Every structure is written in structure tokens, then in C-alpha cells.
């Protein structure tokens, strides 16, 4: 049996590890993006790395692993951490876009924050919808995306990076590519 009260307390404690600080956007050369899809008891994570600010694809990679945690709203970080960490392992990027929330979360600690805290790298939460109970000061809507701080970045810098990577549909191009790759049949790496 999963104890949601304990998990809630763990999440609140972990949220204190988030650091918001400005980054030098002129030094950002590679932006990674990661998304996960599910089929049966398997998770498929896709990683895409693009040049910044051009958005030109440098690398794509997908991995498949077993699912170890059920889907529980607002505890997504427990389900997606393993596949995401496997997908970004040994990859070189300056900032990571995560399909999911960062501080735009009822406990101010979503998936993007968790990944950023674990990796000690700048992460940005990018989501298509808001969760209930989210404070308006934790996100900015950019195109069709709700952008929030994951870790080691300010909301202003996160917005500036996402704005430069929007596609014609108003969503960050690297995340759209990662989404499509995560839903394709086979797993592979391409440079």
C-alpha cells in the first residue's frame, strides 16, 4: 500500500533543495528535452538534444525500461524518474526541458524539479496543462506551454529559452520531437 501522506511530506522536503538562480543564456549551446510514453508495463523515454538557439537536432536517443511505480496524479516524479535518468545518462546538455511540471505543482516540486535536483543541472518544466492548486507565481504561459522552474534556473531565463525553441504550433520543438520518438516502435540512438 502506498502511503500518500509520507510521499507528500517527502516531496515537500525535497522542494527545499530547489535552487533558483540566473544562468548566462549566451553560454547555453545545447538544450536537451525528454518525454516518456507508456505501453503495458513498459516506459519508453526519448531524449533529444538541439543546438541553441537554432533548434537544430544534434542527437536523439530512446530507451525502454519497466514501469516501477503506478500513475498517481501529482506524484508523477516517482513514475518517470528512472526512464528519464536512463535516457539522459552520459548525455551532454546545458539545460534540460522536461515534459512535466517543475515548481508549477501543488507542492512546488514536480518532475522537472526532481530531475534537476538529482542531476544538479538546470531544468525547465514544460506542460500542456496546469495542475489544480498551483500558485500563479510559479509559471508563465509561453505559446501553448506552461513553463516553470525545475532547478538551477530562474523563471525569466526558463521563459527566454523556451520562447526561442517554439515551433509553429506554439510548443517547444525539442519536446514535440521527444514526444513523437517516445511513441514510435523501436528504440535507438542517432547522432
UniProtKB/Swiss-Prot annotation:
**Could you tell me what this protein is called?**
Endonuclease V
Known role = DNA repair enzyme involved in the repair of deaminated bases. Selectively cleaves double-stranded DNA at the second phosphodiester bond 3' to a deoxyinosine leaving behind the intact lesion on the nicked DNA.
Cite a single GO MF annotation. Answer: single-stranded RNA binding
Annotated compartments:
Cytoplasm
Could you state one GO biological process linked to this protein?
DNA repair
Q: Which cofactor does it need?
A: Mg(2+)
Q: Which gene specifies this protein's sequence?
A: nfi
Question: For this UniProt entry, what is the primary localization, expressed as one broad class?
Answer: cytoplasm
Q: Which InterPro entries match?
A: Endonuclease-V (IPR007581)
List UniProt keywords, sorted A-Z. Answer: Cytoplasm, DNA damage, DNA repair, Endonuclease, Hydrolase, Magnesium, Metal-binding, Nuclease
One family from Pfam that matches here is Endonuclease_5
Which CDD domains does the record cross-reference, listed alphabetically? Endonuclease_V
Enzyme Commission number, as recorded: 3.1.21.7
Q: Give the family this protein belongs to, as stated in its UniProt record.
A: Belongs to the endonuclease V family.
Gene Ontology, cellular component aspect: cytoplasm
Q: Which sequence ranges are marked TM in the entry?
A: none
Q: Write out the catalysed reaction.
A: Endonucleolytic cleavage at apurinic or apyrimidinic sites to products with a 5'-phosphate
> Site described as Interaction with target DNA, positions?
71
- Residues holding Mg(2+): 35, 99
Amino acid at each position: 500500500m502506498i502511503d500518500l501522506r509520507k510521499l507528500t511530506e517527502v516531496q515537500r522536503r525535497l522542494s527545499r533543495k530547489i535552487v533558483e538562480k540566473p544562468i548566462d543564456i549566451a553560454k547555453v549551446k545545447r538544450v536537451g528535452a525528454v518525454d516518456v510514453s507508456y505501453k503495458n508495463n513498459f516506459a519508453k523515454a526519448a531524449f533529444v538534444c538541439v543546438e541553441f538557439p537554432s533548434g537544430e537536432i544534434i542527437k536523439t536517443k530512446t530507451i525502454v525500461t519497466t514501469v516501477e511505480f503506478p500513475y498517481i496524479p501529482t506524484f508523477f516524479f516517482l513514475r518517470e524518474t528512472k526512464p528519464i535518468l536512463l535516457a539522459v545518462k552520459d548525455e551532454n546538455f546545458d539545460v534540460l526541458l522536461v515534459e512535466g511540471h517543475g515548481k508549477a505543482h501543488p507542492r512546488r516540486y514536480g518532475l522537472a524539479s526532481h530531475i534537476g535536483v538529482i542531476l544538479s543541472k538546470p531544468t525547465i518544466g514544460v506542460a500542456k496543462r496546469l495542475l489544480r492548486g498551483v500558485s500563479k507565481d510559479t509559471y508563465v504561459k509561453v505559446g501553448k506551454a506552461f513553463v516553470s522552474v525545475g532547478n538551477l534556473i530562474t523563471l525569466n531565463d526558463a521563459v527566454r529559452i523556451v520562447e526561442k525553441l517554439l515551433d509553429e504550433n506554439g510548443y517547444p520543438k525539442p519536446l514535440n520531437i521527444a514526444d513523437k520518438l517516445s511513441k514510435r516502435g523501436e528504440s535507438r540512438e542517432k547522432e
